[in-house]
Amino acid sequence: MQKPKYKRIMLKISGEALAGEKKLGLDTDTINEISRNIKEVYDLGVEIAIVVGGGNFWRGRSGKGMDRTTADYMGMLATVINALGLQDALESQGMPTRVQTAIEMRQIAEPYIRRKAVRHLEKKRIVIFACGTGNPFFSTDTTAALRAAEIDAEVILLAKKVDGVYDSDPNINPNAKKFDKLSFMDVINKGLGVMDSTAASLCKDNNIPIIVFGLNEPGNIVKAVMGEKIGTIVM
């Protein structure tokens, strides 16, 4: 049997992806389907870390008239709801997990400790990172880049609602062009909406490739881990 291309991965799942067609809150069927896809990767022996967004409950930048710092902290708390929901779905399918938060809330999760996170991964536990970086003004994409660098992940899998990176929104422009491969400088200079410039710069500086792919297609996470050509690769 072919071996996975990557031994340790960082999977970034947006809050919107967890909401499914509802676009708000958590959709049980969607989370269970995502968990089944993750199980396929887990069964290959791959070490999996996950960063979840919180956009299905709250977006810091959408809090008009609100103090930005307060709005961002509200968004961090939203990621905890998603992390616990995903943890429950993963464990119901037999995968051991740990949730680590960048803001301490010991009654429901471990505080983020790098060495502990790495040890969990080595013991084949899935680690879910919540609360972003614990600091306002930083996105969960930046969290994924930062944690990936800290735990020595070999790749970031960026699960989106579209099947890659386009030169314009494919939902609006039917003639939008999809990119198979991009450089980090393309992402930073062209503002293609893959991730913010802080996250892209972190990945560039630490030589962490990013694979952007559609989460809605079953088996895509496995395909990415096995090295098949899907979505858009940024490197």
Swiss-Prot record:
Disulfide bond sites: none
GO cellular component terms? cytoplasm
Molecular function in Gene Ontology: ATP binding; UMP kinase activity
Transferase as a keyword of this entry, yes or no, is yes
Q: Where does ATP bind?
A: K12, I13, S14, G15, G55, R59, Y166, D169
| A GO biological process held by the record | 'de novo' CTP biosynthetic process
Q: How is its activity regulated?
A: Inhibited by UTP.
- Top-level taxon of origin: Bacteria
Q: In which pathway does it act?
A: Pyrimidine metabolism; CTP biosynthesis via de novo pathway; UDP from UMP (UMPK route): step 1/1
In terms of CDD domains, this protein maps to: AAK_UMPK-PyrH-Ec (cd04254)
Signal peptide position in this chain? none
Specify whether Nucleotide-binding is a keyword of the entry: yes
Family matches, as Pfam families: AA_kinase
What reaction gets catalysed by this protein?
Answer: UMP + ATP = UDP + ADP
Q: What is its EC number?
A: 2.7.4.22
The principal localisation class reads cytoplasm
Q: Which UniProt keywords apply?
A: ATP-binding, Cytoplasm, Kinase, Nucleotide-binding, Pyrimidine biosynthesis, Transferase
Where in the cell is the protein located? Cytoplasm
Q: Which residues bind UMP?
A: G54, D72, T133, G134, N135, P136, F137, F138, S139, T140
Summarize the protein's role.
Catalyzes the reversible phosphorylation of UMP to UDP.
How would you summarize the oligomeric state and partners of this protein?
Answer: Homohexamer.
Mind telling me which NCBIfam families this protein's record contains?
A: pyrH_bact
Family (UniProt): Belongs to the UMP kinase family.
Protein name as catalogued: Uridylate kinase
Q: Lineage of this protein's species?
A: Bacteria, Bacillati, Bacillota, Clostridia, Eubacteriales
Q: Which gene encodes it?
A: pyrH
